[in-house]
Amino acid sequence: MIDYDYPLFRPPAEANNIIIQVTLGCSYNNCSFCSMYKTKKYEVRKLEDVYKEIDTIARAYPATTKVFLADGDALALPSEHLLTLLKYLQKAFVKLRRVSLYASAQNILSKSQEELELLQKNRLTLIYYGIETGSNLILKKITKGVGQSDIIESLNLASSTGIKISATVILGIGGELYSNEHIEQTAKIINATRVNYLSTLQLGLEEDAKDNFY
């Protein structure tokens, strides 16, 4: 039905929901531990192409209530672009209750509270967010592009607008040497923010990522 651009990733919780690729790849794509989008160049898909896919899916699944916007960090899209998409989705799926996507600290902090509130009012009510670690030392080593304070600020900004957060931290990302640092500093982030769902991931590096990992 839909000609996806692979590889395609989605959170486990979105397994039974509609997935629509509004971007391809990841706008940052520099994390040393992540190989998910290394084969893709970041691209914003044309609205008319996305609309055609939404219309096709709506005809087949008119009772859809949940939609996940792929790829890596769709919140990188300008707010006006996202708002246009959200309004189109609401017209296509009259029973739509929730739209979700991956987001980073950079994405969130690039938007004002008013912009995020408007997106939330138009059904963007859940973001999936990779904290990875709270350690500034490890964040720098894995080239995450943000520090602990950025993570705390972005999570609290999103939470203040009513957007729910499903966050993940990575077990083992500090290795043996930085294990305590990883635990203690990550706990600081969790205690300083309002995360609705928290999960852990086990560190696993593909061969191409091992060469660049600290």
Located regions from the model:
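Conserved SAM/AdoMet-binding glycine-rich loop
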Residues: A58-S160
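Canonical Radical SAM [4Fe-4S] cluster-binding loop centered on the CxxxCxxC motif
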Residues: D5-D49
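Short glycine-enriched, charge-decorated loop/helix-capping segments at active-site entrances
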Residues: M36-K41, K140-V146, Y214
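Conserved C-terminal portion of the radical SAM core fold
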Residues: L126, S149-D211
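Active-site mouth loops of central-metabolism enzymes
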Residues: K41-V44, Y102-L109, G174-E181
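Short microdomains enriched in Cys/His and/or Lys/Arg
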Residues: K46-A63, Y214
